[in-house]
Amino acid sequence: MKINSILHASVVVADTEKSLAFYCGVLGLQQRTDRPDLGYPGAWLQVGEQQIHLLQVENVDPVTGRPAHGGRDRHTALAVSDFDELARRLDKAGIAYTLSRSGRRALFCRDPDGNALEFVA
């Protein structure tokens, strides 16, 4: 048996619409329209051949007390084609980020619910 790829990553959110404003409005991801009724709010977003699933469910995993730098927290890493454009979008939206401490062209930010994201050029 061989695992071929990652199909999706799930992210717990408190407010789907607020999260869509970040993931679609700021980051430019596209929302899929084929999400079935799963009995709770949420959204599926397309990221290349993979997806991010936003789950509006009770979050039993508090985000308080997590490291300020997302690289020291659990996070999802995404490849970007234009690092400077991403930084401009985050700046315009007032979203704080930190640069990678590894020397790579990468940055870390958090979504509206405190979930850490890494973007690598």
Indicate residue ranges for each PLM-predicted region:
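A short, acidic/glycine-rich surface segment
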Residues: 39-40, 59-65
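Mid-chain, well-packed structural core segment of small domains
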Residues: 68-87
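Vicinal oxygen chelate
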Residues: 2, 87-121
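N-terminal beta-strand motif that seeds the catalytic metal site of vicinal oxygen chelate
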Residues: 1-18, 74-78
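Short glycine-enriched loop/turn motifs at secondary-structure junctions
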Residues: 3-5, 68-73, 100-101
